[in-house]
Amino acid sequence: MGQINILIGSNGSGKSNFLSFFEFLNKIYEQKMTEYVALNGGVDKFFHKGSKVTDVIQAEVFWKTNRYQIQLKEGDGRFVVAHEKLGYAAGSMIYYNDIANYTNEAGIKQYKGLKRGDYINNYLTEIKKYHFHDTGKTSPFTKESHIQNDRYYLYEKGDNLAAFLYAIHEETPIVYNRIVKVIQSIAPYFSDFYFHPTAANTLRLQWRDKYSSMVYGPTDFSDGTIRFIALATLFLQPTPPKVIIIDEPELGLHPVAIQKLAGMMHVAASKGTQIIVATQSTDLLCHFKPEEVITVNQVEGATQMVRLNSEDLNHWLEDYTLGDLWKQNIVKGGQPE
Protein backbone atom coordinates (compact mmCIF):
# COMPACT_ATOMS: atom_id res chain seq x y z
CA MET A 1 0.00 0.00 0.00
CA GLY A 2 1.12 3.56 -0.70
CA GLN A 3 1.00 6.61 1.55
CA ILE A 4 -2.45 7.55 0.18
CA ASN A 5 -4.80 4.80 -1.01
CA ILE A 6 -8.21 5.79 -2.39
CA LEU A 7 -10.33 2.72 -3.15
CA ILE A 8 -13.08 3.04 -5.76
CA GLY A 9 -15.47 0.33 -6.86
CA SER A 10 -19.09 -0.70 -7.08
CA ASN A 11 -21.17 -1.93 -4.16
CA GLY A 12 -20.20 -5.52 -3.39
CA SER A 13 -16.78 -5.27 -5.03
CA GLY A 14 -14.98 -5.82 -1.72
CA LYS A 15 -13.94 -2.31 -0.63
CA SER A 16 -15.63 -2.49 2.75
CA ASN A 17 -14.40 -6.05 3.31
CA PHE A 18 -10.85 -4.89 2.69
CA LEU A 19 -11.19 -2.03 5.18
CA SER A 20 -12.80 -4.36 7.71
CA PHE A 21 -9.75 -6.61 7.50
CA PHE A 22 -7.72 -3.90 9.24
CA GLU A 23 -10.40 -3.52 11.89
CA PHE A 24 -10.27 -7.30 12.41
CA LEU A 25 -6.47 -7.17 12.55
CA ASN A 26 -6.65 -4.56 15.31
CA LYS A 27 -9.07 -6.73 17.31
CA ILE A 28 -6.71 -9.68 16.84
CA TYR A 29 -3.85 -7.56 18.18
CA GLU A 30 -5.94 -6.35 21.15
CA GLN A 31 -6.86 -10.00 21.94
CA LYS A 32 -10.53 -9.28 21.30
CA MET A 33 -10.89 -11.58 18.29
CA THR A 34 -13.36 -14.01 19.88
CA GLU A 35 -15.65 -11.20 21.02
CA TYR A 36 -15.44 -9.38 17.67
CA VAL A 37 -16.24 -12.51 15.65
CA ALA A 38 -19.20 -13.39 17.89
CA LEU A 39 -20.65 -9.88 17.55
CA ASN A 40 -20.23 -9.83 13.78
CA GLY A 41 -22.02 -12.98 12.66
CA GLY A 42 -19.81 -15.80 13.88
CA VAL A 43 -16.98 -17.79 12.35
CA ASP A 44 -18.81 -18.92 9.21
CA LYS A 45 -19.38 -15.35 8.06
CA PHE A 46 -15.66 -14.61 8.10
CA PHE A 47 -14.70 -17.46 5.78
CA HIS A 48 -14.85 -16.73 2.04
CA LYS A 49 -18.19 -18.23 0.94
CA GLY A 50 -18.49 -19.98 4.31
CA SER A 51 -16.60 -22.79 6.03
CA LYS A 52 -17.77 -25.38 3.48
CA VAL A 53 -15.65 -23.62 0.85
CA THR A 54 -12.85 -22.12 2.96
CA ASP A 55 -11.26 -23.70 6.03
CA VAL A 56 -8.44 -21.29 6.81
CA ILE A 57 -7.81 -17.54 6.91
CA GLN A 58 -4.23 -16.43 6.50
CA ALA A 59 -2.92 -12.88 6.47
CA GLU A 60 0.52 -11.36 6.23
CA VAL A 61 1.29 -7.68 6.62
CA PHE A 62 4.71 -6.19 6.15
CA TRP A 63 6.51 -2.89 6.65
CA LYS A 64 9.82 -2.56 4.84
CA THR A 65 11.75 -5.62 6.08
CA ASN A 66 9.45 -6.61 8.97
CA ARG A 67 6.49 -8.98 8.63
CA TYR A 68 3.64 -10.32 10.73
CA GLN A 69 1.81 -13.49 9.70
CA ILE A 70 -1.24 -15.10 11.27
CA GLN A 71 -3.32 -18.14 10.32
CA LEU A 72 -6.81 -18.80 11.71
CA LYS A 73 -8.76 -22.06 11.69
CA GLU A 74 -12.12 -23.07 13.11
CA GLY A 75 -12.17 -25.05 16.33
CA ASP A 76 -15.34 -25.87 18.26
CA GLY A 77 -17.32 -23.02 16.69
CA ARG A 78 -14.68 -20.35 17.21
CA PHE A 79 -11.45 -19.21 15.65
CA VAL A 80 -8.16 -20.65 16.83
CA VAL A 81 -4.83 -18.97 16.10
CA ALA A 82 -3.20 -21.92 14.34
CA HIS A 83 0.06 -20.11 13.59
CA GLU A 84 1.42 -16.68 14.44
CA LYS A 85 4.84 -15.56 13.24
CA LEU A 86 7.23 -12.64 12.94
CA GLY A 87 9.15 -12.38 9.70
CA TYR A 88 12.23 -10.57 8.50
CA ALA A 89 13.26 -10.09 4.88
CA ALA A 90 16.96 -10.11 4.05
CA GLY A 91 17.39 -9.75 0.32
CA SER A 92 15.40 -12.50 -1.38
CA MET A 93 15.19 -14.59 1.80
CA ILE A 94 12.48 -14.32 4.48
CA TYR A 95 13.11 -15.68 7.96
CA TYR A 96 10.24 -16.47 10.35
CA ASN A 97 10.04 -16.96 14.11
CA ASP A 98 7.02 -18.49 15.84
CA ILE A 99 5.08 -16.44 18.37
CA ALA A 100 2.26 -18.90 19.08
CA ASN A 101 0.57 -22.04 17.77
CA TYR A 102 -3.02 -23.14 18.45
CA THR A 103 -4.04 -20.50 20.96
CA ASN A 104 -7.40 -18.81 21.54
CA GLU A 105 -6.03 -15.31 21.00
CA ALA A 106 -2.98 -13.79 19.32
CA GLY A 107 0.19 -13.30 21.32
CA ILE A 108 1.88 -10.40 19.51
CA LYS A 109 0.73 -7.79 22.05
CA GLN A 110 2.67 -9.45 24.88
CA TYR A 111 5.60 -10.55 22.73
CA LYS A 112 8.93 -9.58 24.31
CA GLY A 113 11.38 -11.44 22.11
CA LEU A 114 12.91 -10.07 18.92
CA LYS A 115 13.17 -6.29 18.52
CA ARG A 116 11.16 -6.38 15.29
CA GLY A 117 8.21 -7.38 17.48
CA ASP A 118 8.32 -3.91 19.08
CA TYR A 119 8.18 -2.26 15.66
CA ILE A 120 5.21 -4.37 14.57
CA ASN A 121 3.47 -3.80 17.91
CA ASN A 122 3.81 -0.03 17.51
CA TYR A 123 2.20 -0.26 14.09
CA LEU A 124 -0.63 -2.65 14.94
CA THR A 125 -1.71 -0.67 18.00
CA GLU A 126 -2.43 2.38 15.82
CA ILE A 127 -4.46 0.66 13.11
CA LYS A 128 -7.97 2.01 13.53
CA LYS A 129 -10.98 2.01 11.24
CA TYR A 130 -13.01 5.14 11.94
CA HIS A 131 -16.82 5.35 11.73
CA PHE A 132 -18.42 8.80 11.90
CA HIS A 133 -21.72 7.88 10.22
CA ASP A 134 -23.92 7.90 13.34
CA THR A 135 -25.02 11.49 13.96
CA GLY A 136 -28.42 10.99 15.62
CA LYS A 137 -29.68 12.12 19.01
CA THR A 138 -27.94 9.22 20.76
CA SER A 139 -24.81 9.19 18.58
CA PRO A 140 -21.31 8.84 20.06
CA PHE A 141 -20.83 12.60 19.58
CA THR A 142 -23.46 13.27 22.27
CA LYS A 143 -21.66 11.27 24.97
CA GLU A 144 -19.79 12.72 27.92
CA SER A 145 -16.04 12.14 27.93
CA HIS A 146 -13.46 12.53 30.69
CA ILE A 147 -10.89 15.29 30.24
CA GLN A 148 -8.13 13.12 31.74
CA ASN A 149 -8.97 9.54 30.81
CA ASP A 150 -10.27 10.22 27.28
CA ARG A 151 -7.75 12.77 26.05
CA TYR A 152 -5.00 10.64 24.51
CA TYR A 153 -6.34 9.69 21.07
CA LEU A 154 -9.58 10.04 19.13
CA TYR A 155 -11.84 7.00 19.49
CA GLU A 156 -13.01 5.18 16.38
CA LYS A 157 -16.61 6.45 16.60
CA GLY A 158 -15.80 9.87 18.01
CA ASP A 159 -17.14 9.14 21.52
CA ASN A 160 -14.46 11.32 23.11
CA LEU A 161 -14.44 14.15 20.56
CA ALA A 162 -15.12 16.75 23.28
CA ALA A 163 -12.29 15.64 25.59
CA PHE A 164 -9.87 15.19 22.69
CA LEU A 165 -10.57 18.68 21.33
CA TYR A 166 -10.23 20.07 24.86
CA ALA A 167 -6.79 18.47 25.17
CA ILE A 168 -5.70 19.97 21.83
CA HIS A 169 -7.07 23.37 22.95
CA GLU A 170 -5.04 23.23 26.17
CA GLU A 171 -1.81 21.69 24.85
CA THR A 172 -1.43 22.81 21.22
CA PRO A 173 -3.52 25.97 20.68
CA ILE A 174 -2.00 26.59 17.25
CA VAL A 175 -3.37 23.26 16.00
CA TYR A 176 -6.68 23.88 17.77
CA ASN A 177 -7.09 27.26 16.05
CA ARG A 178 -6.30 25.62 12.71
CA ILE A 179 -9.09 23.08 13.27
CA VAL A 180 -11.54 25.85 14.23
CA LYS A 181 -10.67 27.88 11.11
CA VAL A 182 -11.16 24.88 8.84
CA ILE A 183 -14.58 24.26 10.41
CA GLN A 184 -15.48 27.94 9.93
CA SER A 185 -14.52 27.69 6.26
CA ILE A 186 -17.44 25.31 5.66
CA ALA A 187 -19.71 26.53 8.49
CA PRO A 188 -19.26 30.35 8.65
CA TYR A 189 -21.75 30.69 11.52
CA PHE A 190 -19.56 28.58 13.83
CA SER A 191 -17.66 30.65 16.41
CA ASP A 192 -15.86 28.22 18.70
CA PHE A 193 -16.29 25.21 20.96
CA TYR A 194 -17.47 25.86 24.50
CA PHE A 195 -15.53 23.87 27.07
CA HIS A 196 -17.05 23.70 30.54
CA PRO A 197 -15.89 20.58 32.43
CA THR A 198 -18.08 19.37 35.29
CA ALA A 199 -16.87 18.82 38.85
CA ALA A 200 -16.33 15.18 37.85
CA ASN A 201 -14.01 16.31 35.00
CA THR A 202 -16.43 15.22 32.28
CA LEU A 203 -17.33 17.22 29.23
CA ARG A 204 -19.94 17.29 26.48
CA LEU A 205 -19.38 18.65 23.00
CA GLN A 206 -20.79 22.19 23.02
CA TRP A 207 -20.30 25.18 20.77
CA ARG A 208 -21.26 28.79 20.14
CA ASP A 209 -22.74 30.55 17.13
CA LYS A 210 -21.28 33.86 15.91
CA TYR A 211 -24.72 35.44 15.92
CA SER A 212 -26.10 34.25 19.26
CA SER A 213 -25.13 34.03 22.92
CA MET A 214 -26.67 30.57 23.20
CA VAL A 215 -24.62 27.43 23.78
CA TYR A 216 -25.47 24.57 21.41
CA GLY A 217 -24.85 20.82 21.38
CA PRO A 218 -23.74 18.34 18.70
CA THR A 219 -27.28 17.61 17.51
CA ASP A 220 -27.63 21.29 16.56
CA PHE A 221 -25.10 20.76 13.78
CA SER A 222 -26.20 19.27 10.47
CA ASP A 223 -25.14 15.65 9.92
CA GLY A 224 -22.50 16.71 7.41
CA THR A 225 -21.07 19.41 9.67
CA ILE A 226 -20.59 17.19 12.73
CA ARG A 227 -18.97 14.54 10.52
CA PHE A 228 -16.67 17.19 9.05
CA ILE A 229 -15.70 18.34 12.56
CA ALA A 230 -14.73 14.77 13.48
CA LEU A 231 -12.78 14.39 10.23
CA ALA A 232 -10.98 17.72 10.70
CA THR A 233 -9.99 16.69 14.23
CA LEU A 234 -8.84 13.28 13.02
CA PHE A 235 -6.67 14.50 10.14
CA LEU A 236 -5.36 17.76 11.64
CA GLN A 237 -4.56 16.56 15.18
CA PRO A 238 -1.01 17.30 16.36
CA THR A 239 0.21 13.71 16.06
CA PRO A 240 -2.05 11.69 13.76
CA PRO A 241 -1.93 7.87 14.00
CA LYS A 242 0.32 5.84 11.74
CA VAL A 243 -2.71 4.58 9.79
CA ILE A 244 -6.14 6.16 9.20
CA ILE A 245 -8.80 3.91 7.65
CA ILE A 246 -12.27 5.22 6.87
CA ASP A 247 -15.17 4.17 4.63
CA GLU A 248 -16.94 6.86 2.56
CA PRO A 249 -15.83 9.93 4.56
CA GLU A 250 -17.61 12.16 2.05
CA LEU A 251 -21.10 11.18 3.24
CA GLY A 252 -23.27 14.26 3.77
CA LEU A 253 -20.51 16.71 2.82
CA HIS A 254 -20.92 19.71 0.51
CA PRO A 255 -18.49 19.77 -2.48
CA VAL A 256 -16.49 22.56 -0.80
CA ALA A 257 -16.21 20.44 2.36
CA ILE A 258 -15.06 17.48 0.23
CA GLN A 259 -12.31 19.67 -1.23
CA LYS A 260 -11.23 20.63 2.30
CA LEU A 261 -11.33 16.95 3.31
CA ALA A 262 -8.96 16.02 0.49
CA GLY A 263 -6.58 18.76 1.60
CA MET A 264 -6.62 17.51 5.20
CA MET A 265 -5.91 13.98 4.03
CA HIS A 266 -2.83 15.24 2.21
CA VAL A 267 -1.71 17.13 5.33
CA ALA A 268 -1.91 13.96 7.44
CA ALA A 269 -0.10 11.95 4.76
CA SER A 270 2.70 14.56 4.69
CA LYS A 271 3.25 13.84 8.40
CA GLY A 272 3.80 10.15 7.69
CA THR A 273 0.26 8.83 8.21
CA GLN A 274 -0.88 6.13 5.80
CA ILE A 275 -4.38 6.88 4.48
CA ILE A 276 -6.72 4.08 3.35
CA VAL A 277 -10.13 5.32 2.22
CA ALA A 278 -13.02 3.83 0.25
CA THR A 279 -15.22 6.28 -1.64
CA GLN A 280 -18.08 6.62 -4.12
CA SER A 281 -17.42 10.35 -4.62
CA THR A 282 -16.15 11.69 -7.94
CA ASP A 283 -15.68 15.06 -6.22
CA LEU A 284 -13.23 13.51 -3.75
CA LEU A 285 -11.47 11.49 -6.43
CA CYS A 286 -10.65 14.65 -8.41
CA HIS A 287 -8.19 15.78 -5.73
CA PHE A 288 -5.85 12.78 -5.99
CA LYS A 289 -3.23 11.50 -8.40
CA PRO A 290 -3.86 8.28 -10.36
CA GLU A 291 -1.12 6.53 -8.36
CA GLU A 292 -3.08 7.27 -5.18
CA VAL A 293 -6.20 5.51 -6.52
CA ILE A 294 -6.95 1.78 -6.49
CA THR A 295 -9.81 0.28 -8.49
CA VAL A 296 -11.66 -2.58 -6.80
CA ASN A 297 -13.62 -5.10 -8.86
CA GLN A 298 -15.05 -8.54 -8.21
CA VAL A 299 -13.69 -11.07 -10.69
CA GLU A 300 -15.02 -14.63 -10.56
CA GLY A 301 -16.06 -14.20 -6.93
CA ALA A 302 -12.78 -12.70 -5.73
CA THR A 303 -11.78 -9.09 -5.14
CA GLN A 304 -9.23 -7.73 -7.60
CA MET A 305 -7.41 -4.48 -6.79
CA VAL A 306 -5.40 -2.48 -9.34
CA ARG A 307 -3.54 0.79 -8.74
CA LEU A 308 -3.95 3.40 -11.48
CA ASN A 309 -1.00 4.63 -13.53
CA SER A 310 -0.54 8.23 -14.74
CA GLU A 311 1.13 7.12 -17.96
CA ASP A 312 -2.02 5.26 -18.99
CA LEU A 313 -4.22 8.31 -18.34
CA ASN A 314 -2.09 11.37 -19.20
CA HIS A 315 -3.79 11.88 -22.57
CA TRP A 316 -7.23 11.90 -20.94
CA LEU A 317 -6.20 14.02 -17.95
CA GLU A 318 -5.31 16.92 -20.25
CA ASP A 319 -9.04 17.52 -20.74
CA TYR A 320 -10.81 15.60 -17.97
CA THR A 321 -10.55 15.10 -14.23
CA LEU A 322 -10.03 11.68 -12.72
CA GLY A 323 -13.64 11.83 -11.51
CA ASP A 324 -14.83 12.45 -15.07
CA LEU A 325 -12.88 9.44 -16.31
CA TRP A 326 -14.47 7.29 -13.62
CA LYS A 327 -17.95 8.46 -14.56
CA GLN A 328 -17.31 7.72 -18.23
CA ASN A 329 -16.01 4.21 -17.52
CA ILE A 330 -12.52 5.01 -18.81
CA VAL A 331 -11.27 4.22 -15.34
CA LYS A 332 -12.70 0.77 -14.59
CA GLY A 333 -13.80 0.49 -11.00
CA GLY A 334 -17.53 0.20 -10.58
CA GLN A 335 -19.03 3.41 -11.84
CA PRO A 336 -20.33 5.98 -9.31
CA GLU A 337 -24.07 6.43 -9.05
Which residues does each PLM region occupy?
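Conserved ABC ATPase signature
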Residues: I174-N177, K181-L236, I246-Q259
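C-terminal lobe/lid and adjacent interdomain/linker elements of RecA-like ASCE P-loop ATPase modules
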Residues: K260-E337
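Phosphate-binding P-loop
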Residues: M1-G2, L236-T239
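Pre-Walker A-like glycine/lysine-rich segment at the N-terminus of P-loop NTPase domains
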Residues: M1-T54
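Electropositive, glycine-dotted interaction segments
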Residues: K64-S185, S191-Y194
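Short beta-strand segments that buttress and anchor functional surface loops
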Residues: I57-W63, W207
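Walker B beta-strand of ABC/ABC-like P-loop ATPase nucleotide-binding domains
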Residues: I8, I244-I246
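Catalytic acidic motif of RecA-like/P-loop NTPases
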Residues: N5, E23, E250-L251, V256, ...
